[in-house]
């Protein structure tokens, strides 16, 4: 399996975000870049169901999926653009309930 550590980090982060009530269901995505590959949460899978083997892996340059049984997050282009523009190694995009409460 490609990017084992990155996929495990994403699964762990999804669990923490869900357990801490920071996300609900499938709201948001996480990605981690290692070299010329990016691990990213799959589309439509609730955070509490995330496992490393379900995390999608895509090419950093093209976004083409190279591993994972599920489609990458629908916001893949947003993640790739953010990674390229900032030079950072990861992106966390959530729809946190605490950000919309008044």
Where are these regions (language model features)?
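An anion-binding catalytic pocket shared by soluble metabolic enzymes
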Residues: 2-89
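Short glycine-aspartate micro-motif
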Residues: 91-93
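Conserved small/polar residues in nucleotide/adenosyl-binding loops
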Residues: 100-102
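Catalytic metal-binding/acid-base residues of hydrolase active sites
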Residues: 97
């Amino acid at each position: 399996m490609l990017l084992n550590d990155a996929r495990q980090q994403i699964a762990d982060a999804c669990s923490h975000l869900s357990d801490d009530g920071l996300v609900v269901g499938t709201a948001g995505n996480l990605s981690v870049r290692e070299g010329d590959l990016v691990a990213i949460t799959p589309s439509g899978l609730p955070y509490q169901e995330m496992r490393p083997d379900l995390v999608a892996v895509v090419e950093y340059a093209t976004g083409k999926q190279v591993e994972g049984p599920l489609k990458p997050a629908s916001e893949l282009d947003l993640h790739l653009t953010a990674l390229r523009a900032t030079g950072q190694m990861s992106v966390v995009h959530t729809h946190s309930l605490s950000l919309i409460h008044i």
